[in-house]
């Protein structure tokens, strides 16, 4: 039996994304003497944060009323929306669905917003630990969730303990909040253990790709938000694109493909590359360069696929609970 250190908190939050950090901030605002901890597996807050992202600002205004005075590094007011159906060589402009009007919203970077949220949480007394991944849930004698065990360090390729082995501590709390994002390892175990998905539709998932491009001068319309459906996907495959115009001749470009696609030959990343060769997109990107790129999965089932969010000793928030608003194509404000 490995001897492990034990850390104890009132509330343990697993995941340092927008949901986890907003939860920590709000808890301390409501009850300053709570002992709150946030665990983030990435080496730094924001290092693995990835989203479109268009922010509906109302919830952030309520959480941090002064955030607009010191916004994150990328924070562009939305100016105009476009929605199109792409064919192989052209595009047909469609009415923008009412849920996708972005007046009053902002194009942001989650990778820049989350460090600001973490700094705010720490200023309120929250312990934020990066580089620590939760390896297993812990349970009380009555079966309720008691916290998590941090992964062991110094394990050899063979699975044996190496010379630098350090056992991961146990982090125990009265309440554990799972904010791991889509398909988190602890979340999956607890959904199964407590049958949280017994009375909802099966969750569906999408795989999203995103790139930040630096373009030649004069092509970008800051605040323009463009979405498209259609080519290169067939009409049996769920998916589409986003193109968000930033300042300083930069754009976010991305593509999402539903992972329930039927065609075994479909490769989502290849579909993204095809999309960038569409005449309207190629003309925009030609001569530019990719500054950053990433990919992630999203929970895309919507309201009917949300599991039960609470269980004895724990609850799910953010994408761990499938809170993405699919008609709006937004989830950060829900988180």
Residue ranges of model-derived segments:
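FAD/FMN-dependent oxidoreductases across multiple families
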Residues: 237, 263-264, 268-334
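Redox-cofactor binding/interface segments in oxidoreductases and associated redox assembly factors
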Residues: 14, 178, 316
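Helix-loop-beta segment of a Rossmann-like dinucleotide-binding subdomain
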Residues: 91-112, 119, 147, 256-258
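N-terminal FAD cofactor-binding segment of flavoenzymes
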Residues: 41-88
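Predominantly flavin-linked oxidoreductase catalytic cores and closely associated redox partners
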Residues: 120-283
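N-terminal Rossmann-like dinucleotide/flavin-binding domain of flavoprotein oxidoreductases
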Residues: 62-63, 72-74, 80, 108-109, ...
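Conserved Rossmann-like nucleotide-cofactor binding loop
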Residues: 19, 44, 183
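N-terminal Rossmann-like FAD-binding beta1-loop-alpha1 element of flavoenzymes
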Residues: 10-37
